[in-house]
Amino acid sequence: AANTSSSVLGNLKNGEKVTVLGKANGWAKINYQGKEGYVSLEFITIGKDSIDPTNPTNPGQVTEERAVVNASLLNVRKGPSTGAAAVGHLKNGETVTIIGKENGWAKIRFNGGEGYVSLQFLKVKQGSSSYEIVTSSQKVQKPNEAEATQIMQNMKEDAYIKSDGKVVNMKQGFVRANGVINIYDITTGKKLTYVKGGADLKFVKAVDDRIHVQIDGMTGYVNINDVTLHPTMTGEKTSYYATKNGKLYHYVYNPENGKHATYQIGNAPKHLKEGERYEAFDKKQIGGQDSYQYFEYMPLRATSTYTGDEIDNFLRKSNAKSPLIGLGKYFVSAAEKYKMNAGYLVSHAILESGWGTSRIAQDKKNLFGFRAVDSDPYNGATGFKTWEEGIDFCAAYIDKHYLNPSGNTYNGGNLGDKAQGMNVMYASDENWGQQIASLMYRIDAMNGSKDLNKYRLGTLTAGSPIFKSMAEGQTGMTSRNIMVAIKKTVNTPQGSYYEIVSDNKEYNSVYVKAGSVNLVNSY
């Protein structure tokens, strides 16, 4: 209460800032660690930009409006004029919070600060928004987002913020894609990757109307209108990993039917304990330690040892009615022609075509979903005259665009995930690479596990030089972090080098400095 006889909640140090919620009889009602308390007005100074709760017309009061960008690309500037320097840009459809207007310009919150955009390219939403902070024990209403965010962050208990019936910020939780959406680089705004509807991403923080997220160790942002925030305290289901009898299983949640679909990935990392559930936001660090599935992160130029007959035998035992039975020789032939792993090629075809039974596979002899875009898969898919033609064509395309370091969609020559490898741009399904790798594991297990962990895997650091041979100079340089398969170590007077499988099919092997590779544990 507002008197000296009330119990003490805590104390404030000289210079600390507080949010004043009200004033009466010489006392200020303030927010203190998520609760309300009182301090004497004689010991605080109210700044000129403060909100005066006793005077709603106080010019310091921030009245917020929400608006949607109505331009293909809208520059955000330091000041309210076209002569002011651009500090970033907004994409069409993004939502912004307007905190002021001046001469046809809107002052908005942007990247944790403020910026200006032309009002003519904004569509202002009708009505004013209020913000409700929700905890397990209370709900607090606030007139603007900044104040609500500050109060939530100061709370010791878990909390989230709702506005217009939608969660707009939270202390912890995950983010679910409302449809196929892009993830953007926080600094440049460049598209990093994309994910399918229903994909769950780890929540990092909300910065204005952009939500920072993580997937497979990569951080980027998504537009708040493209996702739904699920605070931990609401208990919404999501995907997870678990182990059983030494094997690792992925329980993938489907929000449309409320059920988990399960598949075995391969051997379980030794640090995981049976009976525990592990979050599924980073495939490489399940349980907080290295959990690289070998076939998912092995460069696909590492050839397999299987014959066409062995592939057919696997198909026959796994799915006796599969139309793919008898095509083993074509997968091996294409793999040899384009220097790629035959186990990968057939596993990719199995996943995309449903063991050869899909309508696209049956009608168009297209086993790889080539050109089967998310918006219209069947009509978009390319047709081929024979199975052999389809396999050869798609292998050539993958070789040129995804496995070749000079390819336009090269992100590392392995299946990978949403941070690196083919999965970055080949498919919106964030588990696409993992599912193909799980099939590769099954083929290998049926053939005596001859290829599993044949090479030690590592991450080659971006900018590292690559050498054609130990006798010749540098032949290239990595533009990004990539996975490598180490054949052997070569010690020289100049230092240690690794001979690695080359992503460039012109060479069987290339060499890199051992110090530029971070070794990882695979299973």
Q: What residues fall within each predicted segment?
A:
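Intrinsically disordered, low-complexity Ser/Thr-rich linker and spacer segments
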Residues: 1, 42-70, 78-79, 120-130, ...
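SH3/SH3-like (including bacterial SH3b) beta-barrel domains
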Residues: 2-26, 78-101, 140-144, 185-197, ...
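Short, solvent-exposed loop/edge segments of extracellular or virion-exposed proteins
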Residues: 1-3, 69-80, 138, 181, ...
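SH3/SH3-like beta-barrel fold
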Residues: 15, 28-32, 93, 106-110, ...
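Catalytic cores of secreted/periplasmic lytic hydrolases that degrade extracellular macromolecules
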Residues: 63, 127-344, 355-466, 472-482, ...
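Tandem-repeat architecture and repeat-register "anchor" residues
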Residues: 15, 21, 33, 41-42, ...
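Pyridoxal 5′-phosphate
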Residues: 352
